[in-house]
Amino acid sequence: MDKALISHQEGDQLYDELCHAFFVRSNNGKLHLAPVERPKCVLDLGCGAGVWATEFGERLSDREILWTWALKTGNCSQGVSFMSGPDVPNCQFIAADIQNEWTWLAQHKVDFIHIRGLVGFIHSWPDLLRRVHASLAPGGWLEIADLGPHTLSDDGSLSQAQGLLQFDKLSDKMLGTMGQQVGLVTRLGDMMETAGFQDVSESTRKTPLSDWSDDVEMRQMASTSAALHEMDFRMIASRGLQPVLNLSSEKVEHVLSDALHDMHNKRIHAYKLRYTFTGCKRD
């Protein structure tokens, strides 16, 4: 079995758009947290539908020589292909397997590389980070954003959410079966430093599974956050738990139903952490 976790599939644009809205809201409206100034060449790895890349290009359309490459993941049997972004002249899409050597980038140095939501899709993060570091110009920045793997609570209410706990347990088993490291996202900062990045920083934010919180900021992002988490659970169940663990469709539906029931229970104060790591290439 392919060791990548869950491949993107056709028809996932709705998910990509929801994911984009979620991360931008969790960044208080910012497209990125890295302190990037006047980038001339930007690379968005694993772009999906290209929502982040096109918005980035639109926001910075007045800046000179801004190029945004948005790469799709996966096995590209036809090699590398290029296409322009829709109505965004400074955005170019490249269909290539980002886990292969980046021969198409040999003549360019990049000012900013953006990675979002790729934990579980990459065979070797050390190899990817090595390519990223080599491709950045001196002073260039990398930003990686993703969600933590486990559901959390601060008040012990998660102990009453057996559906969510069971879903997490099966998700961990699925990751182990596929050779993936559980909790890898929490170690990305250390991996960036090992790859040569400096000034590495980590930012986390709680993202609620429902609108249970009285905190103003948590409530403002609750609807987007809850919708994304539910879609994540459904995708993991159908594309991960069932084929990888060889569970029956009835079993998967039961596990998912119990998890969603707990997710919608406002007495269970559950959340997941959004992680963002930034680092600079100084030499």
Curated annotation (Swiss-Prot):
Pfam families, alphabetized: Methyltransf_23
Group of enzyme by EC: transferase
EC numbers, comma separated: 2.1.1.-
Keywords: Alkaloid metabolism, Methyltransferase, S-adenosyl-L-methionine, Transferase
Gene3D superfamilies the UniProt entry points to: Vaccinia Virus protein VP39
GO molecular function: methyltransferase activity
Use in biotech settings: Campesine G features good insecticidal activity against the global honeybee pest Galleria mellonella, which supports its future application in the development of biopesticides.
Gene Ontology biological process terms from the UniProt entry: alkaloid metabolic process; methylation
Reaction catalysed by this enzyme: campesine A + S-adenosyl-L-methionine = campesine B + S-adenosyl-L-homocysteine + H(+)
Pathway this chain belongs to: Alkaloid biosynthesis
Family: Belongs to the methyltransferase superfamily. LaeA methyltransferase family.
Protein role: Methyltransferase; part of the gene cluster that mediates the biosynthesis of campesine G, a dimeric indole piperazine alkaloid that shows good insecticidal activity Galleria mellonella. Within the pathway, cpsF methylates campesine A at N13 of piperazine ring to produce campesine B. The non-canonical non-ribosomal peptide synthetase cpsA catalyzes the first steps of the pathway by producing L-tryptophanal and L-valinal from their respective amino-acids. These products condensate spontaneously to form trypyl-valyl pyrazine also known as didehydrocampesine A.
Protein name: Methyltransferase cpsF
Gene name of the record: cpsF
